[in-house]
A protein has these predicted regions:
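Positively charged, Gly/Ser-enriched RNA/tRNA-binding surfaces
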Residues: 64-94, 101, 113-210, 216-217, ...
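TRNA-binding/sensing appendages of the translation machinery
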Residues: 1-119
Length: 370
């Protein structure tokens, strides 16, 4: 439905069907031409005062983080991610990409007048690259996993309540795309590769002026969390309307307000889950991955967190979050990721799997300098 602004503009211009025309009746190519000419006409009368006003917006301000520090992070990350092919993404993607794949509200995306949009999530663009490559592999009967990584500056238009968050920021992301081979083998193998990358990255950065201590690795499973919520009488729609991914502590507040307690820290899903809730793939993850990682990284902590609600409508299956101790004594969830159905949808093949994870470069450079 059109907003009050649309209704007011329609009334003032005397064009009653303005919104339906813009929303779908005009072809995208025609609307692109229309908007291009409109903005060209407007900017023809712009001057220095207009530039000064525009330059006050946080959207166009430069990052407050030293560029050399960001580049140092990127160099280290690319060195550690030597098993992943490094790609340089376009700063824009197809119109609707962030919403269709990432579930980002279109109002929170910087949409261009040329029927494209600025990246709001690097993993959606990487998913499209995986789709291209997996599509070609299918023609050639190829079955190799596609492993990609990138560093990307993103733009998100939503208001941020947390100090330190800005409309544009840099992330380093990894994706692994391949075929389900049964027995959760894809999830176990590639989740392990991603976790190892981040823990090794933190170690490497510790030698370069950063301080990451006792990283807490939390594994969750959306299927288990959905079952627990259902048993508590909470619908997914109610949860999705209340939880915002960029607001810290959202899960805790949502559950506390409803008097619901979900298992936040468990070690053995088969023994510790409530009766009637199947562990799905978590039991295999414990024996085939988590127990090995505990021996490999004795300074890190590992647990299953089934009280995590952020990402429940974003991921499909196993997801992870890593929160190292920062120099200020707090833990911040700097790494997030999980399994998605994006390549399965794009390739129209339910056996396709995509693991997408990322680390907040800019946030790390602010909070984790020694």
């Amino acid at each position: 439905m059109p907003s009050n602004i649309i209704e007011r503009v329609s009334t003032e211009t005397g064009i009653p069907r303005l919104f339906p025309a813009l929303a779908g009746e005009i072809a995208l190519s025609d609307m692109q031409s229309l908007l291009m000419h409109a903005y060209k006409s407007r900017t023809a009368n712009f001057g220095e005062s207009d530039l000064r006003r525009g330059a006050e917006r946080s959207l166009v301000a430069s990052s407050k983080v030293n560029a050399r520090l960001l580049n140092q992070f990127d160099r280290t990350a690319y060195e550690v991610a030597n098993e992943f092919e490094a790609v340089e993404l376009s700063p824009v993607g197809p119109l609707g990409m962030n919403h269709i794949l990432g579930g980002i509200d279109q109002n929170n995306v910087l949409t261009t007048i040329r029927n494209a949009e600025v990246l709001g999530d690097p993993t959606t663009a990487l998913a499209l690259e995986c789709w291209r490559r997996r599509k070609n592999q299918a023609r050639d009967a190829g079955r190799e996993t596609v492993r990609l990584c990138c560093s990307q500056r993103l733009v998100r238009m939503q208001p941020f309540d947390e100090p330190g968050y800005t409309p544009h920021f840099r992330l380093f992301a990894l994706v692994s795309a391949g075929r389900d081979t049964g027995s959760h083998a894809f999830e176990i193998r590639h989740l392990g590769e991603h976790i190892r990358f981040y823990l090794r990255l933190f170690t490497a950065l510790n030698d370069r002026g950063f301080s990451f201590r006792q990283p807490l690795v939390e594994i969750s499973d959306t299927a288990v969390v959905e079952a627990l919520l259902g048993a508590s009488g909470i619908g997914l729609q109610e949860m999705r309307q209340s939880i915002r991914a960029h607001v810290l502590g959202g899960s805790e507040r949502f559950l506390a307000e409803r008097g619901v307690r979900l298992p936040e820290a468990i070690d053995d899903p088969e023994r510790e889950l409530p009766a009637g809730i199947p562990p799905f793939r978590l039991a295999r993850l414990k024996t085939e991955l988590i127990d090995k990682l505990r021996r490999e990284f004795p300074d890190a902590q590992f647990r299953f967190n089934l009280a995590r609600l952020e990402g429940l409508s974003y991921y499909r299956g196993v997801c992870l979050r890593i929160s190292p101790m920062a120099p200020d004594g707090n833990r911040y969830p700097v790494t997030d990721g999980g399994l998605t159905d994006w390549t399965a949808r794009l390739l129209e093949n339910r056996k396709e799997r995509l693991l997408a994870t990322g680390v907040g470069t800019e946030f790390v450079c602010v909070k984790y300098r020694a």
